[in-house]
A protein has these predicted regions:
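Extracytoplasmic gate region of multi-pass secondary transporters
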Residues: 33-34, 213-273
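Helix-breaking motifs and short loop linkers at transmembrane-helix boundaries and internal kinks
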Residues: 45, 77, 98-103, 315-317, ...
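Conserved MFS/SLC helix-loop-helix module at the cytosolic interface between two early adjacent transmembrane helices
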Residues: 64-103
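Cytoplasmic helix-loop-helix junction between adjacent transmembrane helices
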Residues: 108-145
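Residue-level signature of mid-helix packing/kink "hotspots" within the transmembrane helices
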Residues: 31, 59-67, 152, 276-284, ...
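Extracytoplasmic
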Residues: 14-46, 124, 233-241
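Helix-loop-helix hairpin linking two adjacent transmembrane segments in secondary transporters
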Residues: 134, 139-191
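Intracellular juxtamembrane helix-capping segments at the cytosolic ends
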Residues: 118-131, 333-348
Length: 411
């Protein structure tokens, strides 16, 4: 049976650019939560427990809507799902900007989370349609790599806006404007046919069959643990450095009168930004290297180095920890895309549903992150940060022994 997701190997460069821009926006919307959570807590005078509902609401959206969006994509195609996701991101961002109470902000973040889920669930397999299938892993790595710039930009944009007298919510207004522009572009864009045929449309029995498939199970667990560890590391770098190395948040690399001090007033804030920036750079470098080196070899090397860098960050002195945390971000650059594309390349159909199943596993970002914080509260942040090590070790094991196909030319 022919796969409707790969009928044409024609390259759709314009749609690839638009999809990449969507990924930049959802990167901003994902990482900005960690930047504004303390501002949210202060402005609305809520407890840390209430403030923690922001990331929980965001990742809960993945768990609740990934599979429905995957089914919708297989039935109606990528365009409808991408339009829905972009519209929800715009609506949620506008609601957040105009909200005057904390409940509305939490609801807006949940709506944004649903929109981001839709874009990622449809976008990840859709990228395979936009170029030759043999370039899928490299293209997905490149698009997510450029999109990861959004993760690095939010720690920059919010302080700059506030230094110019704007509210921290202004970033949501700017994002909403961009989303509306993308919505108009996508509405009138011509999409390649990517709908499943009538005989390929999924039912619950097919969903159950996919859910039990060994590759979906093992790699789905890999997504769960990887995203959880990524969140568990990046969200607790500042807490770890404060507790373990007594690094005050006010300590900076620059003088107080400089512009860089206003943007990155602390060393730890800079390292968090570098974690995401180096991850983005690493994805673009890896995308280029995949033209010449086996995707699996690149995956093995980077996943092994991720574990080594994190161990150095946990065990090293202040300087070693700062550098190693930034390098951990760099070496995680291919893990998500390699795990995801290995599953997609292993099946000739049902890519929307598979994307939905894998997207559901992203809820690990909330659960593993919570576990890191809980262990850190009870036994200290060295133990808390160490929770991420076995998660990254599992990803390394997948890179070596996993049965998924990283290259469509693999036997």
């Amino acid at each position: 049976m022919s796969n409707p997701m790969v009928r044409s190997e024609k390259k759709h460069s314009f749609l690839l650019v638009v999809t990449t821009l969507m990924y930049v926006i959802f990167g901003l919307l994902t990482s900005v939560i960690g930047v504004v959570i303390d501002r949210f807590q202060t402005e609305y005078n809520v407890s840390l427990a209430v403030a923690a509902l922001l990331p929980l609401a965001f990742f809960l959206a993945y768990g609740l809507t990934s599979i429905p969006f995957g089914m919708l994509m297989d039935r109606r195609g990528a365009k409808l799902v991408l339009l829905t996701g972009t519209g929800l991101m715009a609506a949620g961002a506008l609601l957040c900007y105009f909200s005057d109470n904390y409940v509305a902000v939490i609801v807006s973040v949940f709506l944004i989370g649903i929109g981001v889920t839709a874009v990622q669930i449809a976008g990840n397999p859709f990228i395979r349609v936009l170029d030759a299938p043999s370039r899928y892993t490299a293209n997905l790595t490149m698009v997510i790599g450029i999109g990861a710039l959004g993760y690095a930009l939010s720690p920059l944009i919010v302080p700059v806006l506030q230094s110019n007298g704007c509210s921290w919510k202004t970033i949501y207004l700017l994002i909403a404007i961009v989303c509306i522009a993308i919505l108009l572009i996508v509405t009138f864009a011509q999409f390649p046919e990517a709908k499943a045929g009538e005989e390929e449309r999924l039912d619950l029995s097919r969903l159950w069959t996919l859910f039990r498939h060994p590759i979906v199970c093992t790699y789905g667990l890999g997504i769960f643990l990887y995203v959880g560890a990524e969140v568990g590391v990046s969200s607790y770098i500042i807490t770890f450095m404060n507790e373990v190395h007594h690094l005050d948040n006010a300590q900076s690399f620059w003088g107080e009168a400089s512009f860089l001090y206003r943007v990155f007033p602390s060393k730890t804030a800079l390292i968090v930004a570098l974690f995401w920036l180096l991850q983005a750079v690493g994805r673009m470098v890896a995308s280029f290297l995949m033209r010449f080196v086996s995707e699996r070899r690149i995956f093995i090397f980077h996943s092994a180095c991720t574990v080594i860098a994190l161990l150095c960050a946990i065990a090293g002195n202040e300087t070693v920890s700062l550098v190693a945390f930034a390098l951990t971000g760099y070496f995680t650059c291919v893990s998500f895309t390699s795990v995801f594309s290995a599953v997609i390349n292993s099946f000739d159909r049902d890519h929307g549903m598979i994307s939905g199943l894998l997207g559901t596993a992203i809820v690990g970002g909330a659960l593993v992150g919570w576990l890191v914080g809980s262990v850190g509260n009870r036994w200290g942040m060295v133990a808390g940060m160490a929770v991420n090590v076995p998660a990254f070790l599992y990803v390394f094991a997948l890179s070596v022994w996993g049965k998924g196909r990283l290259d469509v030319n693999d036997n």
